[in-house]
Design a protein with these regions (language model features):
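ADP-ribose/NAD+-binding catalytic cleft of ART/PARP-like enzymes
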Residues: 1-62
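ADP-ribosyltransferase catalytic core
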Residues: 51-121
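C-terminal catalytic or substrate-handling cores of phosphate/nucleotide-
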Residues: 128-131
């Protein structure tokens, strides 16, 4: 998954934080729950996790189990709801699916870093103006 993550970060042009994490995006419900089960709290400051062994590591199974994250364009096109910025430790990345132009991934843990209130809070190609 190391090479897959490098491809994801390179193609998505997402920032790496001073402490070695990277930032990515996720679309959640209006009340900050995950869109799949509506049971995981994705409000700012929350840490969301699941056992790593339950995250599908097969990149050719593109829609599968795991905590999903994405590049800005992919996440923002994922229907209605709130767009949140995730802070992810690279060690928690399990797979980058092969057929989405390296724009989405699966991990076992992330921290909800912030909420994107409008595109005005973004600069560049998906970079967050403050992190």
């Amino acid at each position: 998954s190391v090479n897959e993550l490098y491809e994801f970060l390179e193609s998505s042009r997402l920032p790496i934080t001073d402490d070695g994490y990277f930032l990515a995006y996720k679309k959640v419900t209006e009340d900050f729950k995950d869109k799949h089960t509506r049971s995981m709290d994705n409000s700012v400051g929350s840490t969301v996790s699941m056992p790593r062994r339950k995250v599908n590591d097969n990149r050719d199974q593109t829609c599968s189990t795991g905590l999903h994250f994405a590049a800005y364009n992919y996440a923002n096109s994922f229907g209605s709801g709130k767009l949140v910025v995730l802070k992810i430790n690279p060690k928690d990345v399990v797979s980058i699916p092969s057929d989405y132009n390296n724009e989405k991934g699966r991990c076992c843990e992330y921290i909800v870093h912030s909420h994107v209130e409008s595109e005005d809070t973004l600069t560049g190609k998906g970079f967050v103006s403050s992190y």
